[in-house]
Amino acid sequence: VRRQRQMCIRDSQKALLSEELFVQKCEERYIICGHTHMQGFVSDGKKRIINAGAVGVPLKSPKKTQYMILTSDGKDWKPEFLSLEYDVDTVIKEIHESGLWDASPYWCRITEHLLDTGELPHGTVLNHVMKLNDYQDPWYNIADSYWEKALDELGIR
């Protein structure tokens, strides 16, 4: 029986490919990763980097959840990328009812926008806020006015 090696990590396939040293030194043939919130598959012919996507807050997939099923034919693993619609309005309602909206209104507004549109992840918005603040303060101390301005400029209501 020939044994295949797999590796699961929390990182992005884009970052892995840009890190040629990592890919060159990695002995595993299959690298399964996440964290980018987007499904994807890349291969250099020898190694395969597979991103399952995101169940909770996927990017580029509005009002849908993503997952992946790996199947083997005994020689190779093949990813099947799946996406299912779910009741985003109920999720947003539950965020409001949980009290999270009161505790972290900007995070909630960004999340609501992302769930509805599949666009503008939290990191992108945070970078915009920090740029408006001229990188003077750590993110948790940035004044609300910068958050409001950033969300307004990005079209997040």
What are the residue ranges of the model-derived segments?
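Residue-level preference for short coil/turn positions at secondary-structure junctions
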Residues: 1, 26-27, 45
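Single conserved hydrophobic/aromatic residue that forms the stacking wall/gate
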Residues: 1-9
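Generic hydrophobic/packing signal
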Residues: 5, 14, 29, 66-68
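Short, conserved active-site entrance elements at the starts or edges of catalytic domains
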Residues: 10-34
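Active-site neighborhood of phospho(di)ester-bond hydrolases with catalytic His/Asp-centered motifs
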Residues: 30-37, 49-53
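Residue-level recognition of beta-strand microenvironments
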Residues: 39-41
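Acidic, His/Gly-rich catalytic cores of divalent-metal-dependent hydrolytic chemistry
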Residues: 43-52, 56-157
